[in-house]
Amino acid sequence: MIQAIELGKVAVLYGGNSSEREISLIGGRAVHAALCAAGIDAHLLDTGDPNRIWTLKDEHFSRAFVMLHGRGGEDGEIQAILQWLGIPYTGSRVLACALAMDKVVCKKVWQSAGLPVLADVLVTPESRFETLVEQLHCQDFVIKPALEGSSVGVSRVKNQEQLAAAIPFAGGARAKIMAEPWIVGRELTYGIVNDTVLPAIEIVAGNDHDFYDYDAKYHAANTQYLCPAPIDAALDARCREIAFAAFQAIGARGWGRVDMIVDAQNRPYLLEINLVPGMTTHSLVPMAAQQIGMDFSALVQSILAQTLTS
């Protein structure tokens, strides 16, 4: 385990101004508590005030643990500021964060690397359901904002009326919105810490949810998390390989989580990658880490230790 004196004064960056602020606040507090319990000189810093980040040098912070989700914190913006300030920080660098944040661009990178992804098309307020049917060759879609996380603004659409409601829910005319085919299958997620792919988790939403949406993630009591996922060894090996290749393809480093869906024919498709995964009581990376004997404190310290060699 790392020595507290090696780390100096640590800023836990949390909060921010994205749609995922509340989740970031919870995760940031959990990380801060774990660091303090380990004797590390850690301090919470809410970047909801955009000027606050610029005081890190003046306040003699040695490094930063980034627990910001969504735009402004997970898209490369805060990472660029930290690099300019010369402060080591957890997780991926600017380009990888920017790629991961934009689901459309990220999928193009994965596709160019030969990794399996679902077809997608961009959606605007003028989009028609019949056109999407022709473009994606199916009659059941997922509509989602390309630049949000935590399943914010995601809808399942089966007709024009539902499409008309889904577009403003995903952000409307100002947002970059995408449509993908609805796949009936098993949702798997793989955490990655220090180039180690953690055991798979299968996510099973309750019968009252069509899919693993924001409510199922953070509020529903009947969402199941099966860890390790009950899948056969060959499929698990294939999915682990895909997850790590997806992580590497965008130049990610440190830690992250890769989400995918496996269809009825056991074909995996990448959905998205999260480079600042949640660290709440519902969060998946801590759950998977426990399966290899890494408790929350050890996980947090392992992630922070990456800043000593970055």
Swiss-Prot record:
It catalyses: 2 D-alanine + ATP = D-alanyl-D-alanine + ADP + phosphate + H(+). Mg(2+) 2 binds at residues 272, 274. One of its GO terms (biological process) is regulation of cell shape. It is found in: Cytoplasm. Gene3D superfamilies: 3.40.50.20, ATP-grasp fold, A domain (3.30.1490.20), ATP-grasp fold, B domain (3.30.470.20). Its EC number is 6.3.2.4. It holds the Pfam family Dala_Dala_lig_C. It is an enzyme of class 6 (ligase). Residues 107-305 form the ATP-grasp domain. Its main location: cytoplasm. Its cofactor is Mg(2+); Mn(2+). Binds 2 magnesium or manganese ions per subunit. Mg(2+) 1 binds at residues 259, 272. Belongs to the D-alanine--D-alanine ligase family. This is D-alanine--D-alanine ligase. The gene is ddl.
